[in-house]
């Protein structure tokens, strides 16, 4: 196998843990029931103490999505100062539970490299696929508990250009959940609107709530229902009620 940095089409600076073959759909109408979901999850050192909550919340969300109607392809990118691809376009029904072997906190926060690399990869897959193979919906869920501080390949302006292009040309959805930062302001620097960004309480309860709400939002997109501006209402209310960020 060639060294990763010489291989084509994958995320930049990523270690690939579980890559699925691209699914080719025979029925040209099947794309109407197909959703591409990309999770970009922070596992930098500041997430220490929330590993179990993150793993449990993610697994619970995936189990809920397995029961939903339609097809879904899951990609999961874990990032610290580098990115690691845990799932690469894997059918949701084939996703195994995340474990503490998969999610181990460490390092800094190369958020922009994780976002930019994932958009580049998924965009290329769609670009070279037959029209009938391109998922009807594509949704990115980005979660971080700190400021960008380690990216080398992408800057905020480049990521903003990429996100705005995918939103305008292909209707991709991007959700941004942030702690210890002004999530709305940070998201705006990346081309993500205030109605798609939310501050969350980075403790056990807040992490669990994140995944509950995100699962509801994904289900809405999968059934082609408009994602309303109040998708984040429960997270907003929790953050305002409990005020700020405390690890438990």
Map each language-model feature to its residues:
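Acidic, low-complexity intrinsically disordered regions
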Residues: 2-248
